[in-house]
Amino acid sequence: MSAVLDTPVAIRRTAMDLLARREHGRVELTRKLRQRGASDELIEPELDRLAEEGLLSEARYLESFIRYRSGSGYGPARIREELCQRGLARADIDQALRESEVNWSERMRDVWQRKFAGQRPQDPRSRAQQTRFLAYRGFPMDMIGRLLSGRDLDDY
């Protein structure tokens, strides 16, 4: 049975339940509350209050999302795009990616090792295949080129 979200208390309770499961961005939390029947006039003040109390934090959400998606083998470009689609500000995303402690070259090498067993491409076709795979995963082309040609990635 779904509760009716027609009071600030009900909205706050539902928002806190969602935040207890995992971090959410403001846009995502607003969308979920709307789907449950809450009105914007009631949602906004409650989300403001949760943010003031430190229970709703875009910075924590960004950090959590970056850690999760990079751990799943995705690079910074793919993560940036996914966060933009979730309604977060590009400047905040870029700052969070810069401040993340993810070693992108190491992460890319791990993904490449798992997929291609560490076999560098022997012909243009296999090089194109490996390049497409890593680019789709969101890793920068210059980093991909360095990995596939066997050059040192420690500059990243």
Curated annotation (Swiss-Prot):
GO BP field: regulation of DNA repair
GO CC annotation: cytoplasm
Keyword Ubl conjugation attributed: no
Chief location: cytoplasm
Matches recorded under InterPro entries: RecX_HTH_1st, RecX_HTH_2nd, RecX_HTH_3rd, Regulatory_RecX, WH-like_DNA-bd_sf
Keyword field: Cytoplasm
Entry keyword Cytoplasm: yes
Places the protein is found: Cytoplasm
NCBIfam families registered for this protein in UniProt: PRK00117.2-1
Classification via HAMAP family: RecX
Family: Belongs to the RecX family.
Function noted in UniProt: Modulates RecA activity.
Descriptive protein name: Regulatory protein RecX
